[in-house]
């Protein structure tokens, strides 16, 4: 088994209340390696049918994101992990500062930041003919502004180790039907490259992971049949695939990798 050298490192992960999600899976992967884990999440209320949450699909996904992080916390407890759970809103500057204040008071530093939290429009208004100011503002507030402010505070509170991993999508460059979401992720990829150059002098690396269609609880059987043929490797990406990539980028072994966008898409995006 690879030793990533993450024991006792402090990893802060946003968007971590969905127990089937990338954030939660990444948190457990860090805990497995002996890292101290900070989960930050915000409840997102969207209508769902509670009778359909027992299987994969949008109802399960919406229900998970509307809840707290108790399921994830229970798993971390069983692992014997050292962890902290914070409910907050990264689109709010004061809230971001409070996140870091709380984490620094408990652990004294933050070594790794995983900007996983994101939002999108699920009402069909993220197209050029229907786009609204609210969709634009809400999407960029979390996906860009929130990630930027989390990164700023990380840099300003930096210690002697620094890894930043942003989460994008394999469709960031072209995402017809969700143009604002795609644009926000393309912006995050551009910021990854620029910030990497700015902070290289501190020995901090900044990279981005761009997942393809990932089973975080939202892909039902019908959609799986549609999307799987688009993936050359013939199967959906799993959250663990993303988490293991993040672990490597957070490790000492990846110390000379920075400013890169790593597509984990089974060949769907090259």
Predicted regions and their residues:
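Canonical Rossmann dinucleotide-binding motif of NAD(H)/NADP(H)-dependent dehydrogenases/reductases
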Residues: 4-40, 44
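Catalytic loop of short-chain dehydrogenase/reductase
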Residues: 19-21, 119-120, 163-187, 192-201, ...
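The beta1-alpha1 cofactor-binding region of Rossmann-like NAD(H)/NADP(H)-dependent oxidoreductases
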Residues: 63-67, 87-99, 133, 240-241
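Substrate-binding pocket helix/loop in short-chain dehydrogenase/reductase
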Residues: 124-128, 132-137, 227
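Short C-terminal tail/terminal secondary-structure segment
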Residues: 125, 225, 229, 233, ...
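Short, small/polar-rich loop/turn modules that mediate ligand/substrate recognition or access, typified
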Residues: 200, 205, 257-259
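A conserved structural motif in NAD(P)-dependent oxidoreductases
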Residues: 231-242, 253
